[in-house]
């Protein structure tokens, strides 16, 4: 997993981590008993189960290594009402059921503190169409799109969005079911692939340029990461995210200080527009004219060895164990 990172990766224009929050990173100097019994929820039944298992096991080990009474809880095998026997929840349940407001609503009903966003932001964030409609209504730049159906006029979609374009399931994460479409003839097949993952499918204008991700923790934008897939004509797909080792991650990201600050501010505005809380990630593109375009939000980001949140935290001087403690501490 090639990665460009220097010890001075912190952008001086970015919002700094405050002294008291930085001190929270000294996880091992604190009393782990303050958290009580912690359920680390991961696995589940969604198409992102494999990623959730990887993320959740990493988080579980990081918490347990610091003396926290943390236990794996898998909704696929356990009755979710049993969560009432815990004091708080670290949610690493990617995809439907864990990232779309369902788990958040249950935990609210049980009165359990939980990491991350609540019902509203989770439900909106898991719906790419609703997210983009909201951002557009707030005056935030997001790539043009159209909702597809079996009876869609494919030629009209191409006339409107141009080629290439990208087709996505509206309610999936981890780039599952996504396809780049280069010709009109490829569009129906891409629709079928995406429709096989869910009930709603969208096409989005292809933005030629550089891809970035912006990690947000405690309403602070961390150093921007530039993503460079080995195949620069393609996109940051599932294979590049989790299985390949030739994707490059650049910190510093190569933007000027002014551009990075602008992208961080845009991402914070997008994060707050959907009422997201705690931690998350915004994906964006910069086109060849230098304009930034919001793609989507992730309210339960990956925490695997390939994941972007740990990379951004590392650029802030925070190791993985400290990061997990810090996120869990948001529930206190």
From Swiss-Prot:
Residues holding ATP: 158-213
Please give the Pfam families that the UniProt record associates with this protein.
Answer: Dala_Dala_lig_C, Dala_Dala_lig_N
Spans annotated as Disordered: 1-28
Binding residues for Mg(2+) 1, per the UniProt record? 283, 296
Composition-biased stretches, type Polar residues, lie in 1-17
According to the record, how does the cofactor bind? Answer: Binds 2 magnesium or manganese ions per subunit.
Would the keyword Hydrolase turn up in this protein's UniProt record? Answer: no
Q: Quote the catalytic activity from the record.
A: 2 D-alanine + ATP = D-alanyl-D-alanine + ADP + phosphate + H(+)
What EC number(s) would the UniProt record show? 6.3.2.4
Q: Which UniProt keywords apply?
A: ATP-binding, Cell shape, Cell wall biogenesis/degradation, Cytoplasm, Ligase, Magnesium, Manganese, Metal-binding, Nucleotide-binding, Peptidoglycan synthesis
Q: Name one GO biological process term.
A: peptidoglycan biosynthetic process
| Domain ATP-grasp as annotated: residue spans | 132-329
Q: In which pathway does it act?
A: Cell wall biogenesis; peptidoglycan biosynthesis
The places in or outside the cell where this protein is found are: Cytoplasm
- A molecular function (GO) term: metal ion binding
Cited InterPro entries? ATP-grasp, ATP_grasp_subdomain_1, D-Ala_lig_Van_CS, D_ala_D_ala, Dala_Dala_lig_C, Dala_Dala_lig_N, PreATP-grasp_dom_sf
What Gene3D superfamilies does its record include? Answer: 3.40.50.20, ATP-grasp fold, A domain, ATP-grasp fold, B domain
Q: Which GO terms describe its cellular component?
A: cytosol
- Compositionally skewed regions (Low complexity) per UniProt: 18-28
Specify which residues bind Mg(2+) 2 according to the UniProt entry for this protein: 296, 298
Required co-factor(s) are: Mg(2+); Mn(2+)
Record-stated family: Belongs to the D-alanine--D-alanine ligase family.
**Function of the molecule:** Cell wall formation.
Could you tell me what this protein is called?
D-alanine--D-alanine ligase
- Record the organism: Psychrobacter sp. (strain PRwf-1)
């Amino acid at each position: 997993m090639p990665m460009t990172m220097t010890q001075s990766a912190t952008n001086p224009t970015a919002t700094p981590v405050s002294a008291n929050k930085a001190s929270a990173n000294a996880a091992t100097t604190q009393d782990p008993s303050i958290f009580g019994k912690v359920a680390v929820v991961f696995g589940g039944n969604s198409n992102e189960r494999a990623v959730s298992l990887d993320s959740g096991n990493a988080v579980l080990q990081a918490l347990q290594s610091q003396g926290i009474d943390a236990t794996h809880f898998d909704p696929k095998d356990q009755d979710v009402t049993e969560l009432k026997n815990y004091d708080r929840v670290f949610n690493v349940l990617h995809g439907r059921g864990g990232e779309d407001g369902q788990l958040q609503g249950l935990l609210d009903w049980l009165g359990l503190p939980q990491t991350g966003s609540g019902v509203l932001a989770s439900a909106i964030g898991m719906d790419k169409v609703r997210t983009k409609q909201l951002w557009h209504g707030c005056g935030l730049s997001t790539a043009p799109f159209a909702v597809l159906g079996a009876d869609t006029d494919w030629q009209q979609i191409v006339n409107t969005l141009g080629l290439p374009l990208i087709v996505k399931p509206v309610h999936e994460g981890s780039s599952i079911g996504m396809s780049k479409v280069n010709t009109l003839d490829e569009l129906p097949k891409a629709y079928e692939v995406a429709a096989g993952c869910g009930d709603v499918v969208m096409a989005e204008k292809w933005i030629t340029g550089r891809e970035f991700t912006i990690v947000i923790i405690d309403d602070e934008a961390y150093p921007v990461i530039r993503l460079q897939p080995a195949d620069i004509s393609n996109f940051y797909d599932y294979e590049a995210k989790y299985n390949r080792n030739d994707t490059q991650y650049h910190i510093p990201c190569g933007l000027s200080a002014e551009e990075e600050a602008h992208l961080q501010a845009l991402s914070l505005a997008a994060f707050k527009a959907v009422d997201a809380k705690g931690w998350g990630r915004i994906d964006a593109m910069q086109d060849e004219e230098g304009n930034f375009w919001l793609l989507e939000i992730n309210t339960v980001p990956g925490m695997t060895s390939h994941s972007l949140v740990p990379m951004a935290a590392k650029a802030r001087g925070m190791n993985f164990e400290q990061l997990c403690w810090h996120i869990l501490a948001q529930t206190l």
